[in-house]
Amino acid sequence: MDVVYKVYQRFFAQVDAVYVKASRTSSIHLSFERHIDHFFDWHIRRRISSALTLGEVLHELELDFLIPDLQEIGLHEDELLCADNAPQMKELLYAHREKILDSYAQERCAAQKYYRAQIAEAKHVCFVDLGWKGSTFSSLEYFLKETCQMDVQISSALLGTEGHAFVDEKIDCGKIDSYIFSSQANADIMRIHNRNGNIWRRIYEIIFTANERSLLRFCLDEQGEPDFVWLRDEVRDPHIIDAMQQGILDFAHDYTQIERRLGVDLVIAARDAYRPLFRILHETDYNLRLFQEFEVCFIAGNVSRQRAEMFKDVVMKGGK
């Protein structure tokens, strides 16, 4: 959401804002104590079709210390992860919950120091993200309020949500605001999005990506101060990213200039805001020419370049 932050700071900054670092992997780690099933869904279930051995999965997740424990549940590190043994891997997570929590202790400490410094004395924090299930927001809400015991109201502004009951509950109580679509507003757009989600979500992610490296997780430096562990350099064209960001900034500049000239605030309705994006999403050939060599891996964790999924591969597989 780097470009959204740039637009806000340049043209709309009425409330103090900072570009807070977060990642799906880190948020999953930080909420592991409460959400082990969520950890399993993102880290293990999504790797079932990846032709990895159990040992390779645990190594990729930096949980090598659990490899000797596979024998306890009748598994071997050289077995391929599959739908049949995945439930036993979930058992492994629950059985060694405390050991895993201990391995994340430094990360929790670093994240707590980082977020306390960023949030400071603020009493209401709104995390801005794309979507789609609000899981990163929910994980950070748990971490900040339950683990860090911070007295802060937390909400999230998303582009769209995908109609899950727990997301609807957070919309009902005002914790999540979904601008373009949800099960409660513009549900027809949500249904179209959900049908095309595997490809469309990746296009959204590319449009709103940045040229800086992505955060993997937090750590402490030698002085005990919060630091960051970054993902390896992802495959993507920095010139295309710069051009997309400049186009977004140019539009925001022209739009706010018109508002000032007319002396009115021109609020863009959700459907109108979505219309050009909706058209772009349907231009598969155009998107393929632009983004075919963009890495779009949707598996959390430090995935090797050899296993990285490219946009062209997703399109060729029909988004599966």
Q: PLM features: what roles do these ranges have?
A:
Residues 1-320:
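Long, low-complexity, Lys/Arg-enriched
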